Amino acid sequence: MTPNAATVLPVAIAGIGAYLPPRVVTNDDLAAVLDTSDEWIRTRTGIRQRHVADPEVATSDLAIAAGKVALADAGLGVEDVSAIVVATTTPDHQVPGTAPLVAAALGTEVAAFDVNAACSGFIYGLRVGGALVATGSGPVLVIGAETLTRIVDPTDRSVAVLFGDGAGAAVLAPDPHGRLGPFDLGADGQDPSMLWCPAGGTRRPVSREVVDAGEHFIVMRGGDVYRNAVARMVAASRGVLEQAGLGVDDVDLFVGHQANVRILDAVAQRLGMDPARSHITVDQHGNTSAASIPLAMVDARDRGRLEPGDTVLLAAFGAGLTFGACLLTWHPDPVGEEGGAR
């Protein structure tokens, strides 16, 4: 079935791309330095390995690499792009944003800005980038990129085993048939300490005391995160399906934020979805926050799980708390001469 035309943006994903650092850290590698084991990690998270960036590699480096692949996949050059949106919670610097650095490296001076919605960031980026395209902009490059291993305490097994580094990107282009949306986004900032870095911002700036206490690292209340992630992703998914006038059986592929396989399984179960429709990459990538959904989309495409015309459901939950979902109709053809995805 086709989503209600009144609820979608006249925008298509014209190309996608991914980049993962070459270094792979397995659960056994972590077990050699932490009080943990491959079995302990797998049974609780589904994670088997994660990619880790070398010390000299920053978030922008990953974003640039993924962006180049996405542009090539779309058959476009950077000169065709009207804006660059980088979704990240691990920027190169507090100031400036990461997107201008990415734009400069790609060779353009178009509008470039960051979106920080944590693990929901890529869906937020699609909404913002899609709106730019829908209101007359040319193609927009949306990138989710993270070096989360830089902000986890390597001695804390509760978080050190969860996260990985990587980047994924999508090129959004005008499409009169409207293939992006609807969206259901939200945030609840009443209890940010559920998943946060306690220090490092203006509330509690970096100091020797902060670093000595490890307060610049991610801390989380795992049980609360699990319950909220499942509830919020289910609610947002139902919201977009209702807006589109679709049922869960109309979804060809579900790509959820790859944080924990138990969360993904619970979301599919509560939606009444066949778990076989859920694409899983958390076992290979770990939690890559804003990069996880585009990385999973590229993996699904490469494995032949995305076909033209497929209805794809994206859903995420992250620090903030932020959450959201969107639908899109997969249409990966390159951008045509008149600017629309063919």
Annotated model-derived regions:
Residues 24-25, 95-97, 152-156, 323-327:
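Short acidic, glycine/serine/threonine-rich loops at helix termini
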